[in-house]
Amino acid sequence: MLIKLLTKVFGSRNDRTLRRMRKVVNIINAMEPEMEKLSDEELKGKTAEFRARLEKGEVLENLIPEAFAVVREASKRVFGMRHFDVQLLGGMVLNERCIAEMRTGEGKTLTATLPAYLNALTGKGVHVVTVNDYLAQRDAENNRPLFEFLGLTVGINLPGMPAPAKREAYAADITYGTNNEYGFDYLRDNMAFSPEERVQRKLHYALVDEVDSILIDEARTPLIISGPAEDSSEMYKRVNKIIPHLIRQEKEDSETFQGEGHFSVDEKSRQVNLTERGLVLIEELLVKEGIMDEGESLYSPANIMLMHHVTAALRAHALFTRDVDYIVKDGEVIIVDEHTGRTMQGRRWSDGLHQAVEAKEGVQIQNENQTLASITFQNYFRLYEKLAGMTGTADTEAFEFSSIYKLDTVVVPTNRPMIRKDLPDLVYMTEAEKIQAIIEDIKERTAKGQPVLVGTISIEKSELVSNELTKAGIKHNVLNAKFHANEAAIVAQAGYPAAVTIATNMAGRGTDIVLGGSWQAEVAALENPTAEQIEKIKADWQVRHDAVLEAGGLHIIGTERHESRRIDNQLRGRSGRQGDAGSSRFYLSMEDALMRIFASDRVSGMMRKLGMKPGEAIEHPWVTKAIANAQRKVESRNFDIRKQLLEYDDVANDQRRAIYSQRNELLDVSDVSETINSIREDVFKATIDAYIPPQSLEEMWDIPGLQERLKNDFDLDLPIAEWLDKEPELHEETLRERILAQSIEVYQRKEEVVGAEMMRHFEKGVMLQTLDSLWKEHLAAMDYLRQGIHLRGYAQKDPKQEYKRESFSMFAAMLESLKYEVIGTLSKVQVRMPEEVEELEQQRRMEAERLAQMQQLSHQDDDSAAAAALAAQTGERKVGRNDPCPCGSGKKYKQCHGRLQ
């Protein structure tokens, strides 16, 4: 009560921020007559003037009034569009490291030109981030004339572009691209083998469009660059045949309940749990199929990978539905983004889930991948010196923006008051009744010429509504992930009188729905339109526009509530843009996922008390409130998941930053010999310590062990026992010095053969390759640690603290391994004289010719001795990466001679 009273007196924080900014808007408006007097050349010259002032030490914030006035004037001259006062407010919010909530149709794209221009004056680059390539390209091309008029360069960063083109795009003053592409470029830059391969500059200012979609909805999805792991596609197919034999039960087994089924599904956490009965059946089926031996347990350590396959297959069948979570197109399983309804080409689920879905759908199973580099959007965007974003719906997530990204949310007022009517929700008992009511509503609305937009939460639901409309003889358009290409054209004409459009989640669609349809689209369809044709099209559009307004504007129908209120608000926000008339209503049923999981008991109890008949709906503020509470529950749960993810990823992030900064330092220097020498000392000291403990008696020394270790690990054959016999005065310290000196001498002899420059280049390559290889293995180990760490909670230990502690010791161990492996590889490398190389090459060519001749012989006579010899030659077993190395060192092949291949 007191807070409400204080807010009334002093205004909310949002009001105070806007009040402060309005004073600056007045200054900008006062400058307008002065700017209008400038010639085009003088207006362009302002950019150079601002840059000169910044170089002399003026603060960027001092330039705001003048810079914004310049952009507004340039926009009037180039586009014939003048920034509204609210757009100037939005521009200032975006410059202050804040999130600007601006309603749909308020001109976010034009608003973004203000802070983009201001921050580009520093010369450090501005990244404008969009949700898809189409929007990045569209916004870049639309705004290019304005920025180029003001003397700034514009770049577009698209997937698949060659490195030189990307480098050029990043070198521009303002770069447009998608969140995925910026993140992947960052990871690729940190896997480069020379400074020239890197494309990004230092991350300075990011301006994120649809910021809630990118920083919240996609925050749980890490960006991963992966390489192929071993092939296990056959196992996915074999395990997939077993799953259809299992029966689902409604509840999980407990002390009070024992079900008849084999597994239960927890829809809230999207997990599948096997029951005791299910485990027994699966083990029987695995034995019957010959996958597992009789008497073995699925939980034994030897079957850990098999358990992984069973879990993945069970999740694929029980949790993932075709045309909801993914579509199958051209024999490929493509993920559908649950938040935007778009397909995510090239993205794959990890942990074998994608392969399990491919096996379920009977398409070709692609190899599993191993993570080479990964980062979450949360951590990528926090790398920027300055971050800001804009969206139509941020206020519901203001707390999350503030606590994770340290970004305040400012709600920017609309240019004209909002007059859309948001009608209360209607709740039906069954899905069929709800769909029927939606069809009736559409019939009523279209009969009076009102356009209707129907929002669904999955492709499956959009096709269900589409089929019902077809049966009812209502003409309509469908916009979902399957019909991606016609997207902009369909949305542009969704405001046509009596038009019916069905769309999956509308987030980030980026095209305004203009009442009466888009006259620009009609003009664009003509080849060479005359002025008369354009005037006629505009006049016809005005008639349609007025008719639609008369009918009540665009009507929005939500076929069910989404988990997040924000996405419902995005759907509503398509109507009532720029003060237009409009209306919206959500239709729900007790069979909807959200109602079933979170709100069923209270609402169905209410419905029973009211004695509802089939086809009747309940419409009451209490119901709407109960649903809003259910959504709040889901939102807070999702927030907790994202926060947890971030807390764990922060540990990996500190390590990632350390590795990447080390790697960049390595890339930028040409001579790493000093580092190599320092590492060599550490490695030899630790190696000798293991066999000659410091300050110990000679009886405690293990000289044969040391000699063998030096030979195996560093290819150093030293007669240490002989030295000690012949030189009694040789003590521990001088012995250590001699071993190190010998290793340096052998290394220097190699350097003399190939030359210093070649050796420096080789050293750098070995360090980079070893670092990348160990980092890749460390990432996999961190993944395994992360998956099982929650079990420490049962031992009364804090899983987060345990994760931090263990991952730190793993990181320290990795850095030690790095030293050993670098020195080991450099010590074992065989250096040849040029004439020796020539001789070996000659031998290799002769051997190749001999094999080719033998192959010809084997074609002529399969039973010949030559064919047998060839078979023996080619049938030699290939050593697996994880097998013991044939050299007898006791190490895995990949960590010994396999590394040198």
UniProtKB/Swiss-Prot annotation:
Under the heading InterPro entries, the entry gives: Helicase_ATP-bd (IPR014001), Helicase_C-like (IPR001650), P-loop_NTPase (IPR027417), SEC_C_motif (IPR004027), SecA (IPR000185), SecA_CS (IPR020937), SecA_DEAD (IPR011115), SecA_motor_DEAD (IPR014018)
Q: What GO biological process, any one, is recorded here? A: protein targeting
Entry binding sites for ATP: 87, 105-109, 512
Top-level taxon: Bacteria
- Return the CDD domains for the record: DEXDc_SecA, SF2_C_secA
* Reactions mediated catalytically: ATP + H2O + cellular proteinSide 1 = ADP + phosphate + cellular proteinSide 2
Known cofactor(s) = Zn(2+)
Which keywords label this protein?
ATP-binding, Cell inner membrane, Cell membrane, Cytoplasm, Membrane, Metal-binding, Nucleotide-binding, Protein transport, Translocase, Translocation, Transport, Zinc
Query: How does this protein lie in the membrane?
Result: Peripheral membrane protein
Task: Report the GO terms under cellular component.
Answer: cell envelope Sec protein transport complex; cytosol; plasma membrane
Stretches with biased composition (Basic residues): 891-901
List the residue ranges of the region (Disordered): 859-901
Indicate yes or no for the key word Secreted: no
Q: Which Pfam family is an annotated match for this chain, by its short name?
A: SEC-C
Q: Which residues bind Zn(2+)?
A: 885, 887, 896-897
The record's note on quaternary structure and interaction partners says: Monomer and homodimer. Part of the essential Sec protein translocation apparatus which comprises SecA, SecYEG and auxiliary proteins SecDF-YajC and YidC.
- Give the family per the record: Belongs to the SecA family.
According to its UniProt entry, the function of this protein is described as: Part of the Sec protein translocase complex. Interacts with the SecYEG preprotein conducting channel. Has a central role in coupling the hydrolysis of ATP to the transfer of proteins into and across the cell membrane, serving both as a receptor for the preprotein-SecB complex and as an ATP-driven molecular motor driving the stepwise translocation of polypeptide chains across the membrane.
Q: What is this protein called?
A: Protein translocase subunit SecA
Q: Which organism is it from?
A: Escherichia coli (strain 55989 / EAEC)
Quote the gene name from the UniProt entry. Answer: secA
